[in-house]
Structure formats: C-alpha cells, structure tokens
Amino acid sequence: MMENFKHTTVLLDEAVNGLNIRPDGIYIDGTFGRGGHSRLILSQLGEEGRLLAIDRDPQAIAVAQAINDPRFSIIHGPFSALADYVAERELTGKIDGILLDLGVSSPQLDDAERGFSFMRDGPLDMRMDPTRGQSAAEWLQTAEEADIAWVLKTFGEERFAKRIARAIVERNREQPMTRTKELAEVVAAATPVKDKFKHPATRTFQAVRIWVNSELEEIEQALKSSLSVLAPGGRLSIISFHSLEDRIVKRFMREQSRGPQVPAGLPMTEAQLKKLGGRELRVLGKLMPGEKEVAENPRARSSVLRIAERTNA
C-alpha cells in the first residue's frame, strides 16, 4: 500500500505563472509528482483547455489516476519521450507550455522503500520507475571500479571519488550491498575529510541516482524535443535543484536564444543566412525562492526557475 508522504511543491505559483496560461491552451506537466503544478494549471484552464501530464513513477501515476477531469490525461513514461506522446495525439507544434520540475521528489526521498535517501535505511534501489532498468545495488555490484569513480566525480562532483569507488567494490566482493545504510556507511568510512554541514554520502547518492535514472540525458532530450513540440509563443518553465541540471537548462536556453553562430567575415548570402534559421527561444529570466518559501520548505533552497518562450522562427 502506498503511504501518503507529504510533498510541498516548490515555486508553485511562479512556475505556473511562467507558462502564461491561456484558458483554451494545451499544456504539458512533464513531472506530475503529486500533482501540485497540474492542479494549479487545471484551475486556470477553461473547458476547452487541455493538460497532458507525464511521470515515470508508478506512485505518481496512481495519484494522477484519481483526478477525474476530462481536460486531464496522464502518461506513464519518461518526459524525454514527450515528442512521441505529443505526435501520437497529433499535437506537434500546438503545445502552449511545458513545465518540468526536475530531480527527486520529497515522497521519493521520504519513502525508505524507494532507496533514495542515506538518512533512511531501505533497499538500495533509487529507480524512479522501479519496474524498469537496473537498481542502484545491481549496478554497483557489476560496475567496474573506474566506472563507479567516473560517475561519482561527474555526477556528484565528489573529490574522493576514487577512494569511495574502491571501497564500494571491495565491500561488494566481501558481501554485496543491498541496503542504503550499508552504502552510506561504506562511503562515510572511505571519506578522509568530513564536511560538518553535509553527510559524506550526499554526493555519492546524488551521483548514483542520476546515473541509474539517466537524469541528465532525460533533460537534454526533453529540451531538444521542446522546440518541435511548442507552438510559437509557447513557454518553457523549468525548475532545477542542483548545478548539473541548471547548467544544462541555462546552456540550452542561451544557445537557442542566440541562433546559429556564423564566424565573422564568412562569405554568405542573405538567403543562406536565412536558411540557417533564427533564434528558437527568447529567454524571459530566472527566479529563486523567497526567504518565506525557504523557511517553510528548506528543500526549496537550491531551486532555480528558468523561463523561456518559443519564437516564431
């Protein structure tokens, strides 16, 4: 039975306001979660409006299926495939806004059985969709030491990546780890210098979770797909929670707002320049949570909301 873990939606009003909701518009909530953003979007839509929600977490799907609204539909799958979902419904180029709330949700962190948290002992899983792919335990038991170290360094920015990777491999040789507490203890023991403000396993758990769920690849594919999915004037409203996510979003919006970069002095006709295309997006800005929101929900502290608009190019 699914427990009712509380989830406070971060930057709720700001992210939805960023979509500039039209009552008859068609919108996508690519990360339904517990439905905070979706419910607010629905409250602003008229009878002709539509909302397509996506999530790969079966628990989120169960929550979404309880919403009885003809304007609303839910898809169980990764948001990276949003272009396919839209094409199946013959809505390519007709979407008025896409909202993405990236990273792991509070219910996923708080449920020990999901294996996302080093603070709660549970199965070493970390999959956002437990029905697909390798669990964290399975990957750590089969991966090479060098590959584990690369993941910890690349996705966790862990300076002791090699030491921790060696400790993980040695422990798994003795007895395979299957619990989050076991991994947290191995990482803590392998970390020579402790940060008094952060648990030593924080970066390792982040890195393994990102790797197991292909999170950064998911983001990159969804952003790329958004250009074909959005209607002219359609909005992108994206919340990220750590620098790796935000870097991808920021770079994408910046590149698509500049248009093709042609070296100075390159002999090209006006027709050739036009063929290259213009700016795909107009960046509208970024927002951070206010002091009041952070005080009420400390997990909002690192969040960043970036908003962009599809041009007519």
From Swiss-Prot:
GO terms for biological process: rRNA base methylation. One of its GO terms (molecular function) is rRNA (cytosine-N4-)-methyltransferase activity. Its main location: cytoplasm. It holds the Pfam family Methyltransf_5. Its EC number is 2.1.1.199. InterPro entries: RsmH (IPR002903), SAM-dep_MeTrfase_MraW_recog (IPR023397), SAM-dependent_MTases_sf (IPR029063). Coiled coil: none annotated. Keywords: Cytoplasm, Methyltransferase, rRNA processing, S-adenosyl-L-methionine, Transferase. It is found in: Cytoplasm. GO terms for cellular component: cytoplasm. It catalyses: cytidine(1402) in 16S rRNA + S-adenosyl-L-methionine = N(4)-methylcytidine(1402) in 16S rRNA + S-adenosyl-L-homocysteine + H(+). S-adenosyl-L-methionine binds at residues 35-37, 55, 79, 101, 108. Specifically methylates the N4 position of cytidine in position 1402 (C1402) of 16S rRNA. PANTHER family: 12S RRNA N4-METHYLCYTIDINE METHYLTRANSFERASE, S-ADENOSYL-METHYLTRANSFERASE MRAW. This is Ribosomal RNA small subunit methyltransferase H. It comes from Salmonella arizonae (strain ATCC BAA-731 / CDC346-86 / RSK2980). The lineage of its organism: Bacteria, Pseudomonadati, Pseudomonadota, Gammaproteobacteria, Enterobacterales. The gene is rsmH.
